[in-house]
């Protein structure tokens, strides 16, 4: 059987010689194929054909050896043994594959943990570590290296706030202070553990430099670590104090700020109280108006007004004499103009003072008349009679009568005779009253008596309205 197969293999026709391509063994980027020359192809053609025939014969012989020689020696036990061997081989392959997959999963978990830790680190810390590694590779002769600042590798100060916010959003925010304190302690412990891991990793990244550093450098590193930790704690305390200052006990309370904060140029450092003008007549702080009490409290004011009036009169007299000495009122010298201007100011002040004095005198007379009416009503009530409340017109007549009595000297309460000044004032008042009444009589009496063109009598130009209505209104024609 083997011989037949061997003869058949020998009797096969030889394959045609094909063009041989050799790939560049250098593994260049271009992956180019090099074509051999014609002389090399002719010499190698026969050798390649013989080698192919020998390889085919060897393969056929191996296949024949593997197959059983006689079919009568093949039984069920041999088949079972073959299947058992195949199953064992498959089980071994599965075990090896499972072990490999477990190791692969563990390595993937470690890579994920490492990636998460690296993601939590700030970018500045990674850049600093990279700079340190570049420095170590560039300078090999340096024996002692300064340890990097681990404070830059710490987690962001607001990471805890972000975690708390995320927990509140997820509905896991702690309600009591004990839970908050325990969570904060746990987070601090985890943060401390993470810092230690980062520190150890930095030492490993430095390589053999840590072995050369002695105990003194290690102690200095520990001191630097403790100092950085103190600084972090101080920053946290300052942040907590700022938060406490920002809080207010009440929404209407003023905002508290730190005194260490510099004052801006736009804000007033010391706010002065602004002066507010207050009129005591319209303020409730001054109480109700009491004219008698006011007159008693400020009884010195009338004397001051009289002195001021006398001073103004004397000043006006002096200015008139000076103006006459400077060539009369038509003089145009600077001194004469200044005197004339000062005289005008004094005259205006004198008129104003005299008007205020007359107004005060009128109010005093009116208050005296009203006080007299009030005392009379009080006596009437004591006698059992009804009080008498006069009209405004009656009060006006009473004031006029009191004025003439006082000017004439007959109605003076002290019984003194009127002075020459009062007599002059009385004459002026009577003259004004006479002119006023005469003008009123001229307006009421018929004027312009003459003869009419057609009639026999004269018609007055104006006449009183006797038909009715308001008697005070004039009749219009």
Swiss-Prot record:
Localization in the cell: Nucleus, Nucleolus
Name this polypeptide is given: rRNA biogenesis protein RRP36
Sequence ranges of Low complexity compositional bias: 206-219
Keywords of the record: Coiled coil, Nucleus, Ribonucleoprotein, Ribosome biogenesis, rRNA processing
Transmembrane listed as a keyword: no
Biased composition, class Polar residues, residue ranges: 1-10
Bias-annotated ranges (Basic residues): 425-437
Gene: RRP36
Region (Disordered): 1-286, 353-377, 403-477
Skewed-composition ranges (Basic and acidic residues): 186-203, 226-247, 353-369, 414-424
Subunit structure: Associates with 90S and pre-40S pre-ribosomal particles.
Annotated function: Component of the 90S pre-ribosome involved in the maturation of rRNAs. Required for early cleavages of the pre-RNAs in the 40S ribosomal subunit maturation pathway.
Organism of provenance: Mycosarcoma maydis
Family the entry assigns: Belongs to the RRP36 family.
Keyword Coiled coil among UniProt keywords: yes
A Pfam entry, by short name: RRP36
InterPro entries reported for this sequence: RRP36
Gene Ontology cellular component list: 90S preribosome; nucleolus
GO biological process: one example: maturation of SSU-rRNA from tricistronic rRNA transcript (SSU-rRNA, 5.8S rRNA, LSU-rRNA)
Coiled coil: 185-253, 333-361
Domain of life per record: Eukaryota
Comp. bias regions, Acidic residues: 47-66, 75-95, 103-112, 138-158
